[in-house]
């Protein structure tokens, strides 16, 4: 009788541990990631092209100097496809990509097949790299970003330049408004 009771208790404890296993596997840091995206202005870059990281660091330094309340940070993804996925699914708002990767993402070509076509906008570019945003990035935020990156200059020159006419990605409306000289309060 004592032996059966021990087996039964062992069975119950094992069953209770196994019943909690799906909960342990379902844990994701999604809530923390959501809070991180809401609290900080994240500028995404990717590890397969370290120049994206260099430019993202410069952009964040500009934001720190001119838009300190944005609490800007660089978020590094493993590759351009991951950045494209985050931008086109509205999980990220800003990213630095090589010009060719940004064009491929905009057209859903090459490694970006199946991504939401035309879901990005350009804000600025520099030395073959483009600062892109999600097409849902608010206009007034894009205006502030454009004001910061176009007007801030240091020993390395301007942070970003206005995208050239040869870039097929449309300019974000907020950045366009800034470049046309419209004041921020005209947008709100």
Predicted feature residues:
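An extracytoplasmic/periplasmic, membrane-proximal ligand-sensing/linker region
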Residues: 154-188
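A bilobed periplasmic-binding-protein/Venus flytrap-type ligand-binding module shared by bacterial periplasmic
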Residues: 45, 122-141
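N-terminal export signals
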Residues: 7-27
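Short, polar/charged alpha-helical segment
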Residues: 52-68
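A ligand-binding cleft/hinge motif common to bilobed small-molecule-binding domains
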Residues: 92-113
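Short helix-initiation/N-cap motifs at beta->coil->alpha
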Residues: 68-85
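Short beta-strand->loop
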Residues: 109-125
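Short, well-ordered beta-strand elements
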Residues: 37-49
